[in-house]
Amino acid sequence: MNISKPEQRTLHVLAKGGRIIFTRNSSGKVTFVECYTREGYVLADCTLPVFTKLKNKRLIHSKSGKPYQINMAGLKAVRPQLDNQ
Protein backbone atom coordinates (compact mmCIF):
# COMPACT_ATOMS: atom_id res chain seq x y z
CA MET A 1 0.00 0.00 0.00
CA ASN A 2 1.36 3.42 -0.95
CA ILE A 3 1.51 5.74 2.03
CA SER A 4 2.86 9.29 1.77
CA LYS A 5 5.38 10.71 4.25
CA PRO A 6 2.83 12.80 6.21
CA GLU A 7 0.53 9.76 6.41
CA GLN A 8 3.47 7.64 7.58
CA ARG A 9 4.42 10.16 10.28
CA THR A 10 0.83 10.34 11.49
CA LEU A 11 0.49 6.56 11.62
CA HIS A 12 3.79 6.30 13.50
CA VAL A 13 2.58 8.75 16.16
CA LEU A 14 -0.73 6.88 16.45
CA ALA A 15 1.08 3.54 16.75
CA LYS A 16 3.02 4.91 19.70
CA GLY A 17 -0.16 5.85 21.56
CA GLY A 18 -1.23 9.12 19.93
CA ARG A 19 -4.75 10.16 19.04
CA ILE A 20 -6.58 12.38 16.56
CA ILE A 21 -9.04 14.87 18.06
CA PHE A 22 -11.71 16.03 15.61
CA THR A 23 -14.46 18.64 15.35
CA ARG A 24 -17.68 18.07 13.39
CA ASN A 25 -20.02 20.66 11.89
CA SER A 26 -23.81 20.62 12.27
CA SER A 27 -24.22 18.13 9.41
CA GLY A 28 -21.78 15.66 11.02
CA LYS A 29 -18.84 16.17 8.67
CA VAL A 30 -15.35 16.39 10.19
CA THR A 31 -14.08 19.95 9.69
CA PHE A 32 -10.97 20.16 11.90
CA VAL A 33 -8.42 17.61 13.15
CA GLU A 34 -5.41 17.73 15.48
CA CYS A 35 -3.07 14.82 16.10
CA TYR A 36 -1.60 14.59 19.59
CA THR A 37 1.35 12.43 20.62
CA ARG A 38 1.14 10.46 23.83
CA GLU A 39 3.23 13.20 25.47
CA GLY A 40 0.63 15.82 24.48
CA TYR A 41 2.47 17.53 21.61
CA VAL A 42 0.65 18.46 18.39
CA LEU A 43 1.83 16.90 15.12
CA ALA A 44 1.93 19.51 12.34
CA ASP A 45 1.81 16.90 9.53
CA CYS A 46 -1.68 15.73 10.48
CA THR A 47 -3.99 17.86 8.33
CA LEU A 48 -7.57 17.33 7.21
CA PRO A 49 -6.52 15.86 3.80
CA VAL A 50 -4.10 13.43 5.52
CA PHE A 51 -6.83 12.44 7.98
CA THR A 52 -9.29 11.87 5.13
CA LYS A 53 -6.81 9.66 3.25
CA LEU A 54 -6.09 7.55 6.34
CA LYS A 55 -9.80 7.21 7.05
CA ASN A 56 -10.61 6.24 3.44
CA LYS A 57 -7.83 3.64 3.50
CA ARG A 58 -9.37 2.33 6.76
CA LEU A 59 -6.11 2.61 8.69
CA ILE A 60 -7.70 4.53 11.59
CA HIS A 61 -11.01 4.21 13.44
CA SER A 62 -13.14 5.88 16.08
CA LYS A 63 -15.61 4.17 18.39
CA SER A 64 -18.57 5.95 20.03
CA GLY A 65 -17.37 9.45 19.13
CA LYS A 66 -14.00 9.00 20.87
CA PRO A 67 -10.72 10.25 19.31
CA TYR A 68 -9.44 8.38 16.26
CA GLN A 69 -6.79 5.73 16.87
CA ILE A 70 -4.83 3.34 14.70
CA ASN A 71 -6.34 -0.09 13.98
CA MET A 72 -4.73 -3.42 13.07
CA ALA A 73 -4.60 -2.59 9.35
CA GLY A 74 -2.81 0.65 10.20
CA LEU A 75 -0.32 -1.16 12.42
CA LYS A 76 0.49 -3.55 9.59
CA ALA A 77 0.89 -0.69 7.09
CA VAL A 78 3.21 1.46 9.21
CA ARG A 79 6.91 0.99 8.49
CA PRO A 80 9.43 0.77 11.34
CA GLN A 81 10.99 4.12 12.13
CA LEU A 82 13.79 5.10 14.48
CA ASP A 83 12.75 7.16 17.46
CA ASN A 84 15.16 10.02 18.13
CA GLN A 85 14.00 11.03 21.58
Curated annotation (Swiss-Prot):
It comes from the Bacteria. It comes from Hahella chejuensis (strain KCTC 2396). This is UPF0386 protein HCH_03746. Belongs to the UPF0386 family. Coiled coil: none annotated. Disulfide bonds: none annotated.
